[in-house]
Each structure stands twice: as C-alpha cells, then as structure tokens.
Curated annotation (Swiss-Prot):
One of its GO terms (biological process) is L-leucine catabolic process. Transmembrane segments: none annotated. Mn(2+) 1 binds at residues 275, 290. It comes from Mycobacterium tuberculosis (strain ATCC 25618 / H37Rv). It holds the Pfam family Biotin_carb_N. GO terms for cellular component: plasma membrane. This is Biotin-dependent 3-methylcrotonyl-coenzyme A carboxylase alpha1 subunit. The gene is accA1. The biotin-dependent acyl-CoA carboxylase complex is composed of AccA1, which contains the biotin carboxylase (BC) and biotin carboxyl carrier protein (BCCP) domains, and AccD1, which contains the carboxyl transferase (CT) domain. The AccA1/AccD1 complex forms a dodecamer. It is an enzyme of class 6 (ligase). Binds 2 magnesium or manganese ions per subunit.
Length: 654
C-alpha cells in the first residue's frame, strides 16, 4: 500500500478522499489554487502545495504543476477525484511516465470511453445493447440528415466528445434537424474542441440508470448494483438513489452483466460507472449510453447499500491488490438516496449564487452522511462548480430513506449563501418522486411549480428582536444608549427596522428591552416577546410560543434558519427607507457572482430599456443584463472585473 497520496482535486470530493486516506494511515497531500488557500481540503490534508491562480487551466488542470507537486511531496499515487483531470488520458499517461500511480483506469480505457462513437462500437462487440443510431467518425450534416430517416424520429444529436449535456439536441421534426446540427456542432467545438456528432433514437420517457463496477489488474470485475439518476436538471444530476425502484431482480442481473462486459472490453482497472438509458415504459429494455472512467459524485449511495469504501478499493487496486470479494459476495442492503446542495437560487431560474459562508449547519444521526467542502468563512465564488455539499440518507427501505433525507435537509443550513435546499425538499415531497415514477423530465416539469417560501411573521419578528438585542449589546450598559423605547413625556416609542427579504419586506416595530419586549410586524397585532441569543442559536418567544433559530449576521445582513427553511433578511433603519422617489437612478445589478466579459454600452450614452448593458459569466454560463429603463447610463465596471452577487454594475438616470 502507498504511504503518500496526492489528491488532485478540491471541494467535497477532496475532503472525502482525504477522510479515507486518514483512516488507512496514508499521508495525504492537497493541491490548491489561490482562492482555495484556506479551503477545507487544504486544512485537512497532511501537506498542501499551491498550484497557481484561480483559473483551472493555470492550476487544477495544469498537468505539469500537479506532477511537480507529487514529486516535491514524495507522493506515490494521485487520486484525481472527479472533474478536472479525472478523465484526461494525457494525464493518466503522464503519471505512468513519471512513475506515479494514477488511481484510475489505463489511458487507453479513458481514450476509448471518452470518444462516444468508439465507446459504442467497443461495447457492441461485447454484446452490450446500444441505442439504435448512427455512430461513425467524419459524418457530415448531410449524412446525418439521411441517417436520421433510417434511425427514426425523435432523434438525439450527441457530441462524440465531452458530456454534461453540452452539444446535445432533441429533434422531433425532420425540418428542424439541419439547424439543430449546426447549433450542436458550434457548441461542441466551443466546449470540447471537437465538433464530431452522432445520432441516437430518443428513448421515450427515458430513465438514467447507471451501474457501479470495480475491476482489478488480475482480470476480476464485479458490479455493485445500480443507481437511479433520473432526477436531473439540464442533464445535471440533482438527486440519486440506489437501488433503482424501477428494475426487477432479473433486469438488475442482466444490466450488471452488461456493465461488467463494458469494463472488460477496454481492460478496465479501478472504479467506474456504466450509464444506461432505460425507458420507463419498457423497464426490461436498456441501452448503453456511456462509461464514466472515474469515481462518480453519487458514489456514496452505493457505499451505503454495499458497506464498501470505494476510495479504499481504488487505492487497493491501484497498489496491485486483487479484489477481496466475488460477485456472489456482494449483498445490497436497504436503500440510499443522495441530494446535492448547490449554490444556486431555484426561484431565479437556478442562477448561480455565492458569497462568504457565515455559518454552516450539517445534519447527523442514524443513516445520515454528509460529504461537504464547507467551513465557516468559506468563500463561494464563480471559478468552480457550485456543488457545496451532498446529504445522503440510508434506510431499511426507500420510504425510510426518503423520510430520513427530508429530515436531514431540514437540519441543513448554509448561512451567507443562497442554496437549493428548499427546492430539494419540494422535490422529495412530490408524489411521483415518492412512488418512484421517474424519468429525466420530471425535475424540469416540477421546477415550474416551485415557489420559494416567503419569510413568515415569526422570522421577521425574530429579525426585529435580534436588532433590538444587538443595539442593547452595543450599548454595553449605557442606560441612555440602550433601546428601552422610553422618551421624555413618559411614552414609549418603538425601534423600527425595515426587514427586506427577496419575497417580502415589512417594517418590524419593537418596544422595550430584548428580554421583555413587544413586537409588531407591519400593521399586525402587537405581541409580547423576548429573545435570547447565543453564538449559534436565537430563541424567540412570542405570545408564549418559543421557536429556536440558527442565525448569522454580517454587515446588516441577517440569515435565519429553522426546519422550515433559510431566510436572508437585509436590515435598513426606518429613516433610510423614505427617500425622494424620483431622485434615485435605476440600477443594473448582478444576480450572481462572476466575471464581466463584455460591456455593451459606453458610459454617459443614452440607452433604451431592454438594451444589454453588461454580460457576466458565472459557472461557464453567460448572462446578459439589460437596462430596466431608458436613460443616460453610468457604467461602474470594466471587462475582466470580478463582481459579487447584488453588486451594482451600472446606474441609469432619466
């Protein structure tokens, strides 16, 4: 076994790999870019090496720098995690030349499976079923149009290189195919540097089911059951589970054999995942889609039902050991479901979010696991993937796993950064999800019905009472500075605070000291109230009913969470709210953290409502920000500037 392993990744997967290395007594080495200098994976590793600045191509994707870090620290092996260099055949080959063990498959396996056309042809030779279609190198648009008539509509255009849904197009009308091919080639070339396309017949009501395989260098291959990954948004998985509620035992055995044959066709070594497409209408029929030649984000659900540590077996296989079990030894126990917590705002079309994590609260308990990259103080920016945390629940059956996951998410809060936790719970409560009636369109269909929960009265009241407590604390015993509310003449005046949330804003009035106060939200009833505040908990009693909240505050931004959700309250003193309405210019505000890649207007020019003012890139997506009104524009940013969420980028005045 190795004594030092370098983890060539970041975020939750790096933390998770380091956890296994620590358990096995193996020295861990982290690598990091400048924004990640204080990241959790860096702090938890035994050693760490700086790679370079934020752009991945200058840090995490720089093969030379990663191998140099391994040489400097004496690492005998490199674990690539997922993403970055994990499926890079050149990196695997470079590791071999440097005599460092790449904890993944041989370079040839990565090359074959990374080319969708070559992969389909390779697995078909081993009797693995493939989707009817046409997959040859060098197919022109005219050839693809001709072939589509034979394949049968609807057809799915797919790029030979890459993944993540980029370059994919669903075409149901033959007249739209030529235009879709042009668009798909352009996106494939932009994303992967390769515009090779192929066609597949589109499977109606498709379900995405994948099989985990493990293979050693001695010819042994086993599968560890399947995972259901149909709950996706824009081809990105959100909730995954194992086993699939769709497959019967006979189909499970057949699809497992097909996955093992897929691994054998490229002499696979290590952990890999074979993805299949299965029609919800024909669950006994499955087709090969692709093989991911790495550990998957969703591997914890397989670990939960098998009791195996997949990272440990990557290490053992990489060190030359044989698998310590045969196919008949593997028993699937219970059901496990994983939810991915992203930095995104579901109420704003899932725009990426960001900011500084003020506090993080993660669940624990029977059957609950959390794989996380977060610490208080972590800065979530736009340089990397928005995945923050994975919450996994294991139960005796699917119903128990669903309930445990929902309860775990209710105890999950990331204060300081907007996340999708509320949306995840919305999905778990959906009837189709509860009964397992899934396909890859379910999540997108249900997204349209999601509405974020406005801040309830008690949360707004808690915000006002917290403000009263903070004022009293700052007074530090100064009788005249404390917010008692008493004024000359014997009457009591309230301290008013405007509490603004994305969906609701109210003025909260508080009379008296925080331990014995009265509170009013808007024009509602005046209630007796009190508040007690500790470092992580705020206990508020209103009319005899006590509620406990988790909280964090910075720069008059207060975050409050309980089992119902998380709310971001912005405080403004009452006198600052009443301004001359016409005097304030309209603003163009960034809805997410990112980088300015274009400024489309000149500062001082006259523009019209709807004109694009600034283009911001975040998470590899471009967002054009338009003028809300007509007028003269003052641009406040330049191309290349890094901007924060809600940062004012331009002002427009009549």
């Amino acid at each position: 076994m190795f004594d030092t392993v370098l983890v060539a990744n970041r975020g939750e997967i790096a933390v998770r790999v380091i956890r296994t290395l620590r358990r096995l007594g193996i020295r861990s080495v982290a690598v990091y870019s400048d924004p990640d200098v204080d990241a959790r994976h860096v702090l938890e590793a035994d050693a760490a090496v700086r790679l370079g600045p934020a752009p991945a191509r200058e840090s995490y994707l720089d093969i030379g720098k990663v191998l140099d870090a391994a040489a400097r620290t004496g690492a005998q092996a490199i674990h690539p995690g997922y993403g970055f260099l994990a499926e890079n055949a050149d990196f695997a080959a470079a590791c071999e030349r440097a005599r460092v063990v790449f904890l993944g498959p041989p370079a040839r396996a990565i090359e074959v499976m990374g080319d969708k056309i070559a992969a389909k042809n390779a697995v078909a030779a081993f009797d693995v079923p493939v989707v009817p279609g046409v997959a040859r190198a060098g197919l022109t648009d005219d050839a693809l149009v001709t072939a589509a008539a034979e394949v049968g509509y609807p057809v799915l255009i797919k790029p030979s290189a890459g993944g993540g849904g980029k370059g994919m197009r669903l075409v149901q009308d033959p007249a739209r195919l030529p235009e879709a091919l042009v668009s798909a080639r352009r996106e494939a070339m932009s994303s992967f540097g390769d515009d090779t396309l192929f066609l597949e017949r589109f499977v109606l009501r498709p379900r995405h089911i994948e099989v985990q395989v493990l293979a050693d260098a001695h010819g042994n291959v086993v599968h560890l059951g399947e995972r259901e990954c149909s709950l996706q948004r824009r081809h990105q998985k959100v909730i995954e589970e194992a086993p699939s509620p769709l497959l019967d035992p006979q189909t499970r055995e057949r699809i497992g054999v097909a996955a093992c044959n897929t691994a054998r066709c490229v002499d696979y070594v290590g952990a890999g995942t074979v993805e299949f497409i299965v029609s919800a209408q024909r669950p006994d029929e499955f087709f090969f889609m692709e093989m991911n030649t790495r550990l998957q984000v969703e591997h914890p659900v397989t670990e939960a039902i098998t009791g195996l540590d997949l990272v440990e077996w990557q290490l053992r296989v990489g060190a030359g050991e044989k698998l310590g079990f045969a196919q008949n030894d593997i028993e699937l126990r219970g059901h496990a479901i994983e939810a991915r917590v992203y930095a995104e705002d579901p109420a704003r079309e899932f725009l990426p979010t960001g900011g500084r994590v003020l506090a993080v609260f993660e669940p624990a308990g029977p059957g609950v696991r959390v794989d996380s990259s977060l610490l208080g103080g972590t800065v979530v920016g736009s340089d990397y993937d928005p995945l923050l945390t994975k919450v996994i629940a294991h139960g005796a059956d699917r119903e128990e796993a669903l309930d445990r996951l929902d309860q775990a998410l209710a105890r999950t809060a990331v204060l300081g950064v907007q996340t999708n936790v509320e949306f995840l719970r919305f999905l778990l409560a959906d009837e189709r999800v509860r009964v397992g009636d899934l396909d890859t369109a379910v999540l997108d269909e249900r997204s349209a019905d999601f509405t974020a929960r406005p801040a309830p009265d008690d949360v707004l009241a808690a915000g006002g009472l917290y403000r009263q407590w903070a004022l009293a604390r700052r007074a530090q015993g100064d009788l005249w500075a404390a917010p008692s509310g008493w004024r000359g003449g014997g009457h009591m005046a309230p301290v008013r605070t405007a509490m603004r949330t994305p969906l609701r804003s109210e003025t909260v009035s508080v009379w008296g000291p925080p331990e014995s106060a009265q509170v009013q939200v808007g024009d509602g009833e005046i209630d007796c109230a009190s508040v007690q505040v500790t470092r992580e908990q705020m206990s508020v009693t209103i009319s005899g009913l006590r509620r406990d909240y988790r909280w964090a505050e910075a720069d008059r931004h207060l975050w409050i969470a309980d089992e119902r959700g998380t709310w971001h309250l912005r405080e403004a003193e009452e006198h600052k709210i009443h301004r001359a309405v016409g005097a304030r210019p309209a603003e163009v505000v960034s809805p997410m953290p990112g980088s300015v890649i274009a400024v489309q207007v000149e500062s001082g020019s006259q523009i019209s409502a709807g004109d694009v003012v600034v283009v911001v890139e975040a998470m590899k997506m471009e967002h054009s920000l338009e003028a809300p009104v007509s007028g003269r524009v003052q641009v406040l940013v330049s191309v290349g500037d890094q901007v924060k969420v809600e940062q004012v980028l331009a002002r427009i005045k009549d």
